[in-house]
């Protein structure tokens, strides 16, 4: 990877994949954190630790594949592992298209019209087809704007929208559920960025890995914590909205609402380019034509997106989180000295 992309480009690539429609709209935050009350912020920090550790392990795995040809060849085609990866990227890509559909139909155009989601999918296909470098270039522009806008909406909501004391709860009875929820959310997001992070690991300096993992995770934690607070201190109806942060933005001001709707579309696009790229890479292991792999992936994504945004997030994401735990343990196991067969007390990659 070129020096000018550096750590900043890598962090923006990872965050662009993770901060999709589900996170920036608040829907994921309600499902995994905010519905349990104010104490969920503590568990968002647990998510930060797990996410940072997972990112580092994924990048290290990418370095193994790049430095050890025999290691890469050994795990090149694993049907079960590859199928799980493909399923995960299909779900995430479909969620982004369904999120775009929900956003445009409910808050912007007020009617059901598939053309907009098809256009977003088409643009994502064009960018994804040009590889990781093009995705990084796009993310370096869009992701800082997404982060600043999400932080701004969260902060503005403290001053310009009706508040409620109902959600300001420190209910400790949900601690067990929150622990599981935070773990699932961390692994869920690691799965979104799984393929691109592994590929990234093979292209960056080893000394950059920890810095990229920590900074990406800190930014993610700050965004999650701010969204949790914004959702909990505002009107009770916010938690029950299909796109809570959009709903909150419109409560502040109609202009703010429409502006943030555009930001959510950027979120959808950055995540979709990463997940669609990853999905086509999975399909490409079985279908040798890269172009046909991309077309096949895009068609599958569009069909699955017809099930709707809310249904996909509520029922598929926890399952993906559970799958993610198994896959991360598999990756961790592969990167032990026994697996790389170096026959030394310390791994040759260190």
Language model: regions and residue ranges:
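Small-residue-rich segments of transmembrane alpha-helices in multi-pass membrane proteins
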Residues: 13-19, 40-44, 73-86, 142-158, ...
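Juxtamembrane transmembrane-helix boundary signature
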Residues: 43-72, 229-230, 234
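Hydrophobic alpha-helical segments and their helix-loop junctions in multi-pass secondary transporters
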Residues: 21, 90-93, 97, 145-171, ...
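Extracellular loop-to-transmembrane helix junctions
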Residues: 4, 8, 30-56, 210-225, ...
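Transmembrane-helix boundary/entry motifs in multi-pass membrane transporters
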Residues: 2-5, 34-39, 61-90, 106-113, ...
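Extracellular/periplasmic helix-exit of transmembrane alpha-helices
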Residues: 55, 184-185, 216-248
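Membrane-interface loop-to-helix entry segments
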Residues: 100-104, 113-119, 127-158, 313-331
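Hydrophobic, membrane-embedded alpha-helices of multi-pass small-molecule transporters
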Residues: 5-24, 40-44, 85-89, 93, ...
């Amino acid at each position: 990877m070129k020096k000018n992309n550096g750590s900043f480009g890598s962090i923006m690539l990872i965050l662009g994949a993770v901060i999709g429609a589900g996170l920036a709209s608040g829907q994921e935050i309600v499902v995994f954190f905010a519905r349990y009350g104010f104490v969920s912020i503590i568990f968002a920090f647990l998510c930060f630790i797990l996410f940072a550790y997972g990112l580092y392990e994924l990048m290290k795995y990418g370095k193994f594949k790049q430095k050890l040809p025999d290691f890469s060849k050994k795990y090149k085609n694993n049907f079960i592992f590859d199928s799980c990866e493909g399923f995960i990227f299909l779900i995430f890509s479909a969620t982004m298209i369904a999120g775009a559909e929900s956003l445009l139909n409910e808050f912007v155009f007020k009617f059901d019209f598939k053309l907009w989601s098809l256009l977003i999918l088409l643009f994502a296909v064009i960018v994804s087809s040009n590889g990781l470098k093009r995705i990084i270039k796009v993310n370096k522009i869009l992701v800082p704007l997404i982060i600043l806008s999400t932080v701004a909406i969260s902060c503005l909501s403290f001053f310009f929208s009706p508040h409620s004391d109902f959600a300001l709860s420190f209910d400790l009875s949900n601690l067990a559920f929150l622990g599981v929820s935070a773990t699932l959310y961390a692994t869920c997001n690691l799965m979104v960025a799984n393929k691109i992070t592994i590929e990234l690991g093979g292209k960056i300096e080893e000394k950059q890995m920890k810095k990229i993992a920590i900074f990406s995770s800190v930014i993610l934690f700050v965004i999650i914590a701010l969204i949790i607070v914004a959702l909990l201190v505002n009107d009770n109806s916010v938690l029950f909205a299909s796109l809570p942060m959009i709903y909150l933005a419109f409560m502040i001001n109609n202009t703010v609402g429409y502006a943030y709707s555009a930001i959510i579309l950027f979120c959808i696009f950055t995540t979709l380019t990463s997940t669609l790229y990853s999905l086509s890479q999975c399909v490409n292991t079985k279908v040798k034509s890269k172009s046909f792999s991309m077309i096949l992936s895009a068609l599958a994504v569009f069909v699955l997106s017809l099930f709707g945004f809310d249904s996909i997030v509520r029922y598929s994401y926890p399952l993906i989180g559970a799958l993610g735990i198994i896959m991360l343990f598999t990756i961790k196991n592969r990167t032990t000295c026994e697996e790389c067969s170096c026959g030394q007390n310390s791994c040759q990659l260190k």
